[in-house]
Amino acid sequence: MAMLPVAQLYRRDVPALHTPEGADLLQVLWCPFDHQAMPRTTLFWRSAATVSDILNTPPEPPAMRSDGYLPEPCLLNPEQVTEYPDHLELSKERREQLGAWSEWQAAVTDVDDYASSPELFYDRELAAAPGWKVGGWPRWGATDPTPRLCPACGSDMDALLTIATFEGDDDRSWLPNEVREDREHTGPSSRHTGPEGQAVIDFFRAQGIEVHDRGRVPRDARVAPLGTNPAPRQPTAVQIGSGYDQQLYVCPAAPEHPHSELMH
């Protein structure tokens, strides 16, 4: 069975992409059938100068497990953002700081819905960004954090690429520009930090945690429901399981070592 193209990333476009020596291009392909509940991926590290005979339209497979395994072609517009690990990956001391709800109330307005679960506010509003991304942290929930060790040398593996079903959810601060622009009320630019956002930043800095505002959308840009067009939330038409992410990991010591993948 021929494998399908999933992503093609150039180092010139994605500075965070750590490639092996002599390579500046990553091509990700997968089998359009399940292997342990998700498509099996293959990585090709290449030199862009050696790529020729480019197909404008890749061939479609004669059969596949799901239509969600056939990505829609998309032109990437990458943006660098700062995100943080899920609360389950934090130290006990940091988790205790997150549980101090009175401090959250003093720093942020309109957050009473999270009073019983302060860590949920952190995970949704500040931690790992949803959507397709290079590097970054996983968004745990379906499973608890799992060790990611290189099968060849035992080194801790680094996140390479997240293949996501959705680019954003209705209840998260992280939104792609297309979704924000599709709202009935757009509000200020995502690069502007209002009083609420600055209060969150000040709160974390007081705990000795450096915080950046890039990638967050002010609350008044999130008041309207998502538009009727689902494409901004799912531009690639990819679906992993019932709406999960598939994250690929590589060995930082030797990217040519076998990679691993997790669904979460």
Enumerate the language-model features and the residues they cover.
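Preference for intrinsically disordered or flexible, low-complexity segments
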Residues: M1-H264
